[in-house]
């Protein structure tokens, strides 16, 4: 069962809408769905909400330490409430997935993500869960640092938001400790939108919906 949901990002209005803050967008969306309010908590170096789901307390956390020091916040809360690494989900932006794509996995390397590196170091254990939200790649490694700190175009932001909505539909499975089912649900391809119906000009004959006899 996931007891701690962590969204990664950078604090401050100048970063709020940037790609690197996709994890914050996710925890904000979950807080709205659960009608919980994230509040500053100095003890955990971030914004925290305690919510009750299935009769059990669970926590939402947004570290306010800047991305590279996220582990300080996560480890402080996890140790105080005796939350094991396998009961933690960390949501973060992912360059190697396109906007609208996501991947859920447990453990593994930080793959160059500084927030994950610090969490892994502070917990002393890599076996926490990660939800990777695709933001796309600029195509040139030298441009990555600037790319993640820019706002995505509206179409990309909409794709990321739609991906977040789909992932939230699987949270109940995480609360029920059914991570394989949550993974299958998140990794399923989203349904294709139906093509728009043809627009008929005024006065034009309406095409038949069925072949005439």
Curated annotation (Swiss-Prot):
Q: Gene that codes for this?
A: pth
As its record notes, the protein acts as a catalyst of: an N-acyl-L-alpha-aminoacyl-tRNA + H2O = an N-acyl-L-amino acid + a tRNA + H(+)
**Which residue ranges does the record annotate as region Disordered?**
186-213
Q: Which cysteines are joined by disulfide bonds?
A: none
- What family is it from? Belongs to the PTH family.
Active site at which residues? 20 (proton acceptor)
In the UniProt record, which is one GO cellular component term? cytoplasm
The places in or outside the cell where this protein is found are: Cytoplasm
GO MF terms listed in the record are: peptidyl-tRNA hydrolase activity; tRNA binding
* InterPro entries documented for this protein: Pept_tRNA_hydro (IPR001328), Pept_tRNA_hydro_CS (IPR018171), Pept_tRNA_hydro_sf (IPR036416)
Record function comment: Hydrolyzes ribosome-free peptidyl-tRNAs (with 1 or more amino acids incorporated), which drop off the ribosome during protein synthesis, or as a result of ribosome stalling. Catalyzes the release of premature peptidyl moieties from peptidyl-tRNA molecules trapped in stalled 50S ribosomal subunits, and thus maintains levels of free tRNAs and 50S ribosomes.
Tell me which Gene Ontology terms the entry assigns under biological process. Answer: protein quality control for misfolded or incompletely synthesized proteins; rescue of stalled ribosome
Annotated organism of origin: Leptothrix cholodnii (strain ATCC 51168 / LMG 8142 / SP-6) (Leptothrix discophora (strain SP-6))
Please describe the quaternary structure of this protein.
Monomer.
Please tell me where tRNA binds in this chain.
15, 66, 68, 114
Tree of life domain: Bacteria
Q: What is its EC number?
A: 3.1.1.29
Q: What is this protein called?
A: Peptidyl-tRNA hydrolase
Where does this protein chiefly localize? cytoplasm
In chain numbering, the residues marked as site (Discriminates between blocked and unblocked aminoacyl-tRNA) are 10
Q: Where is the composition biased (Pro residues)?
A: 196-213
Question: What keywords tag this UniProt record?
Answer: Cytoplasm, Hydrolase, RNA-binding, tRNA-binding
